[in-house]
Amino acid sequence: MTAPALDLVALLRELVRRPTVSGDAGAQRDVLGTLTEVLRERAPHLQVTEGRDRDHPWTLLRTPADPGRRQLLLACHVDTVPATDPAAWQRDPFDGDLDGGRVWGRGGSDMKAGVVAAAAALAAADPGTPVALLLTSDEEIGSQGAAAAAAAVAELPVGAVVVPEATGNQVVLGHKGALWLAVRTAGRAAHGSTPERGHNAVLDLAALLARAGGVLPFRTDPFLGTETWNPGVVAGGTVPNVVPDRAEVVVDMRTVADGGDLLAWWRAQPEVADVEVRVDLPPVGTPADDPWVASLPAPVLPTPATYFTDASVLVQVVRGAPIVVWGPGTPAVMHAVDEYVELAEVEQAAAAFTDVVSRWNGPPAGSRREP
């Protein structure tokens, strides 16, 4: 008996109802298992590879097509950012309410809608079509699940990649990379009533940050734009009446090339005692004239995505295959209170991905790529 087609709405609501906050490996692993079960019920021929990293789980599902043919890879993450201050939400962020043609809740746009659309395309794929679905964890904290899966992806002859993040179903050709640094200053503790006997690490950090914005060696790319920085987290000191002997800022920089020059700048500053690299992901950019991109049934935006995606990991292992960010959802509500996704966009994405999969010819590895 043939299994029913994947119910987009029911699956999306179930996923939203199950919190999968980055760093919660158990919750993410459970959802990976649910998705695998749902897909295997509808496509029992799918081959499944599960990652062994306990902290950053991942799953790769693919058709049993000729392994020597180039794979179309759909790459999704199942984690979300936290739903901070639930009282500020008009609805419970994990109820998955269906109202007004929208599914409401954390992860609706980022990116459980994309997961569902990609899963529908894989479930409908002919077993002979070389297509794979990569499901990762912990994308929101530096694409750690994708990094754990990178070696497995590197073994595939990937011909093209779709990352179904929220773009309003428009094709995006890339985004900046990310360099997150923990920059630390060191001082000398003393009683707060005699600050002259100590050295204040917080004041050093404040002076450093005040200077950095005007002198950081930012570069500009014609497509990606100019590099940016955001000192996102600052910490220092212990109690008011002690001169702080340490302080730290975590800086988020979005890069258009290798981040070595920026890292070197921070390390060279006189106030800096130590720099720790937390995230280092390269930028992504696919040529607009790529023949496969031209074949996609969606408009191509002339601007990059403002966020980074797992594409920053995949670009390092797919040997020049074109990568697009393309999926359902509204970028403006990603990480926001009252996140939602339009059901019409989810249905449109599922249909478009299914069409792209059905037309994928999977040329032999080593041959010239074709759309």
Q: Each predicted region: which residue ranges?
A:
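Generic recognition of long tandem-repeat/solenoid scaffolds
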Residues: 59-63, 98-105, 272-275
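Acidic/histidine-rich catalytic neighborhood of metal-dependent amide-processing enzymes
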Residues: 111-180
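Active-site phosphate/pyrophosphate- and oxyanion-stabilizing loops and adjacent acidic/basic residues
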Residues: 37, 147-151, 294, 312-313
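Acidic-glycine-rich active-site phosphate/pyrophosphate-binding loop
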Residues: 83-99, 158, 173-184, 324
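Short glycine-aspartate micro-motif
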Residues: 71-73, 103, 157-163, 180-182, ...
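Metal-dependent amide/peptide-bond hydrolase catalytic core
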Residues: 2-3, 10, 20, 49-52, ...
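Active-site metal-coordination/substrate-binding segment of hydrolases
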Residues: 71-135, 337
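N-terminal helical capping/dimerization or prosegment-like subdomains
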Residues: 1-86, 246-252, 263-268, 343-347, ...
